[in-house]
Amino acid sequence: IAAVKKAKAQGLKIPVVYNTSGYERVETLKNLEGIVDVYLPDFKYTDTTYAKRYSNAPDYFDVTKAALAEMVRQHPAPQFTDKQEAAVRGIEEGIMTGGVIVRHLMLPGLLKDTKAVIRYLYETYGDSIYISIMNQYTPMPFVENIPELNRKVTHREYDKAVDYAIGLGVVNGFIQEGGTAKESFIPEFSGEGLE
């Protein structure tokens, strides 16, 4: 936090993006107020059964819901650089400089919960957030004992989720096309080099 504050005081012009699981304490987020420009949280489930089974977090929905509310309190509407601000900042026009983009990674077989996540986000926040519906789930070897997760999301499942979002009226959204469910999209989490 101190480094970002110092960089901003010295003229940092690019937006600070906080990439988070979404499972955050509100107190932590309050400490980031005025530091983070764009929040990029995940919102995985509404159903506590899935949250407990796949994330060992039966309180996932309540914790993430409260965290997201705090993020939106800090950034109640998306902001983008216009031509003048882009010139001043030395960055491209149309770059998000404030706001919240909520990512939902669709899991195989959980279309009903994906729809519940999209419905909750849109009914609660409307166009004040962006919703990114992701289809890049890639089954890794450690899920071979969880049969329902041991496959990719089908095109049909994903298309139904996207159609559902469009039917609700979601316009501030992102979708994925093409072959995004590959191991090459997964960063290495070996912890090498960390102390």
Task: Describe each PLM feature range.
Residues 1-38, 48:
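Conserved Radical SAM active-site core
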Residues 5, 26, 30, 65, ...:
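Amphipathic, non-transmembrane alpha-helical secondary structure
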